[in-house]
Regions:
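Active-site helix of classical SDR
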Residues: 29, 65
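Short, flexible catalytic-loop segment of classical short-chain dehydrogenase/reductase
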Residues: 92-102
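Alpha-helical segment proximal to the catalytic Tyr-Lys
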Residues: 34, 78-81
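C-terminal helical subdomain
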Residues: 89-90, 109-157
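Residue(s) in the substrate-gating loop at a strand-loop-helix junction
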Residues: 49
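Substrate-binding pocket helix/loop in short-chain dehydrogenase/reductase
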Residues: 5-6, 10-15
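Active-site loop immediately N-terminal to the catalytic Tyr-X3-Lys motif
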Residues: 7, 54-60
């Protein structure tokens, strides 16, 4: 996750986030959907973020990319639902992953860490996100969980 203020963040970082978060999802779906449509079933579970539902300071490009994943997932769901293909979205809140090791804007990283500390320093365990994905996957083909938002109980945003 490449955090930064739109006034000074390198546009190359914007492109990297769009390529990964939006085009990566598009490419992945384009690869797997033809076979799912042909066999009339299958699940696609896309990963987004709560940043795809609300804004966060110093997250402009990241937020834009995750809003894109939300819109893309819902649009494709509408396109393939008649073919019995399930498109689901998981939108985690702050989680303990390596994503923040890529932040190049120290001020943005500091702001994130202050926000995290204001919530007691606790964020979502990645295992909880994985359990959520498995829960969606294990649903019968006749049930499509369109979206799940998941965050640590103490996350205030």
């Amino acid at each position: 996750m490449l955090l930064g203020n739109v006034l000074n963040q390198d546009p190359a970082e914007w492109k990297q986030m769009m390529d990964t978060n939006v085009l990566g999802v598009l490419n992945g779906m384009q690869i797997v959907l033809p076979q799912m449509v042909e066999r009339q079933g299958g699940p696609v579970i896309n990963m987004s973020s709560l940043a795809g539902k609300k804004t966060f300071t110093n997250h402009a490009a990241y937020v834009a990319s995750k809003f894109g994943v939300h819109g893309l997932s819902e649009t494709v769901r509408e396109e393939v639902s008649a073919k019995n293909v399930r498109i689901s979205l998981v939108a985690p809140g702050a989680a303990e992953t390596e994503l923040l090791t890529h932040v190049t804007d120290e001020s943005a990283l500091n702001d994130y860490n202050l926000w995290k500390e204001s919530m007691g320093g606790t964020t979502l365990a990645p295992e909880r996100v994985a359990q959520t994905v498995k829960f969606i996957y294990d649903m019968p083909q006749s049930v499509n969980i369109r979206e799940i938002n998941i965050a640590a109980t103490n996350q205030n945003a």
